[in-house]
Amino acid sequence: KSFALLYPYSIPLYRRLGWEIISNKMTYVIKDTQVPQKIREPGYVRRVAWDDQDFKLLHGMFAAKTHGCLYRNKLAWEEYFRWDEDDTVVAIYYTAKDVPTGYMVYMISSDILHVKEMIYLDREAQLGLWEYIHKHDSMIDEVRGNNYYSEPIAFELDDSDIKETIRPY
């Protein structure tokens, strides 16, 4: 079965008409000193091309278990990252057994690491990606990113005094 999703220009209006928000978008800002530092995961992170199959397969696995995350067909992939390919990097976390379990799409600009998307299938990948971010600490003053509402960031940090914004999406 198919169903339609739309982003309303007026949430109160659409609620009066019987529609509801199914997901939230969370953004965060973390100072470089707040990025987790004592992480030593057994896997590794590799930068890959935009057409890498592990990248797209990981998103499909994540979408299958995450509320509000849509599967992306070829057109959706092209539209979502259309203007980003030249400026951003795709980095995949692999376990010690070379199994991909997480990725992040990011760019570094004006001493800020911008995370466009970070997904992980397990705790090891989550920590491994944060370890990768920490390895860039000499290049950045802060991390700004987007995250799925079901994946809180502040709870994971030693210093959880960060800025998080939650908006309907």
Where would I find each of the regions flagged by the language model?
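Contiguous, non-catalytic segments that form substrate-binding/exosite surfaces or channel walls
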Residues: 28-44
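Conserved active-site alpha-helix within GNAT-family acetyltransferase domains
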Residues: 2, 7-26, 128, 150-167
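Short, mixed-charge, low-aromatic patches
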Residues: 11-18, 33-36, 84-92
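Residue-level detector of alpha-helical recognition elements and their boundaries
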Residues: 21, 28-29, 92, 144
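Intrinsically disordered, low-complexity, positively biased terminal segments
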Residues: 40-169
